Amino acid sequence: MNAVVRWFAPVVPESRVAILRTVLYAFVLLDIHLFVRDPIPLSRHPELYSPLLLVRVLHLPPPSVPLTVTLYVVLLVGCVVAAANRLPRLAGFVVAAAFTWWTAIGMSYGKVDHDHMALVVALWVLPTVGVVAGRWGSRQRSAQAGWALRCIQIAVVFTYFLSALTKIRSGGWSLTSWPESSILLWAIIRRPNGLGQFLIAYPELLRVMQWFAFLAELTSVVVLWLRGRALLLAALFWMGFHVFTVTILYIHFAPTAICWLAFAPLERLGPWLRRVVARRRQRAGGPTAGESGAVAGDQAVDSRGQRTHARQVHRPAEDRVRAAGEP
């Protein structure tokens, strides 16, 4: 039982959560302007509105322009506050509720994007960690932070695994119906973009790619037990997978891809940035953190608190003038 608890709630640095909060709340601001950006204009067409199951269960009111504009303003303010790790519980849960409703409206007009699942889960679990003392520079570790990150990791992986199950279900619960179909060829013909239009002449290659993607999604749960370099290779594989889908279909998975940061040791980012700043100061000839520079006219103080004479620092021009006056 203890092993199960440790797996679901490992003790990890809280700074990892603080950094991930900043990144994800900033991404939400990007998302509502680039990806799910149409709830306000869509709310002007109530006749096209077909609410999702979640909306029906929660009995949420139908969208209107005042409602969607209010959600937009709440998301703007809430994300700015939460990204700064201020009022993490209040701002975090407000953003989670507003963004869930916002995306539910945007996806109640005929198209549901499953790439937002991990992001929505992340917004709901990150506020549970509460205040992180020291924010990015925190040295505290807790199981609360580990539980939140594990939830995000599970949501990321299940984005792929549930996609594979959906393919099996839509094919009559057959393991071969989807990968043996011509769905990828059909998708490219429907939207001939990028590299995809050059692959139309190779339907067998496209079928091999379908099998590869299907098996990768079906076995994606293995990622949850990987560590070290194996985990890094898995993350790079899925990033490459998303780059490939963009190049052949112009379909991105940015909300899922950004949530892969839940697997990363983000706590190393703060010390790394401090080292970079220290190196730049050294190259510029200035003092690094914790050091002081000599100032002309200052006197040193010995261990007994008495002043001793220190050699003064002169400018090069003054040195040349003095040298010219000496015999």
Place the predicted regions along the sequence by residue.
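Alpha-helical membrane-anchoring segments
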Residues: M1-E326
